Amino acid sequence: RRLQLLEEVAEKANDYSGQIFTYQLDVQDADQCKVIAEKFIAEANGISCAIANAGTGGDDGLFSGTSSQINNVLNTNIIGVTNSLMPFIPKMKEQKNGTLVCISSVASYVPLPFHGGYASSKIAIRMIFDSWRPSLQKYSIKTVSICPGFIDTPIVKGPARSFPMVSADKAAKKFIRIIRGGKKTYVYPRYYLFLIFLVRVLPERIFNFIMKKMFHRPIN
């Protein structure tokens, strides 16, 4: 939605080879996404890689008496991903090649208090990719789920900024290597694998006690 920022990135990217296209759209709008995808395919003469990076954070508004906050997270992070990527699949099938990428999260493995909508949205897109993978492989279409921890971007706000973070530039360079390497699901940074291991082995009672002590209010 932030056209000015897109145009600034496009201007900086002119220093590199290739042609830059910028479009403004709402990923919750399936019709807009389809129109833009078809426009890009026509202008770029195909599609090699589509990355669904648009997303939002925030807490569930658990005690607000309304589902508007959690619904916005779910609609953006799940429906936004399918809206963004599915219009490209027929062309990739026709080409018999392509790569689809979703930005999941370490939160898809760790149930964070007050952030059930965010965590479940990231589980959902990871599971969607896992289910798509066998069907798309026969058309040489790769599916890559990247599960980052805290990355230093504007989406990370409030108490969440007290956690160790990786710079956006460093993360972006790593993501490129992950995509080129054809990884299926990749947790980054790798030290989060230990946290995921603890979630799996700790008794639920102990895990919930730790979560209540660490996260007694929303972190973002």
Residue positions per predicted region:
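Active-site loop immediately N-terminal to the catalytic Tyr-X3-Lys motif
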Residues: 63, 112-116
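Substrate-binding pocket helix/loop in short-chain dehydrogenase/reductase
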Residues: 61-74
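Rossmann-fold cofactor-recognition segment
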Residues: 13-31
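Conserved NAD(P)H cofactor-binding loop of Rossmann-fold oxidoreductase domains
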Residues: 53-58
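Residue(s) in the substrate-gating loop at a strand-loop-helix junction
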Residues: 105
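Active-site helix of classical SDR
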Residues: 85, 121
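C-terminal helical subdomain
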Residues: 145, 160-196
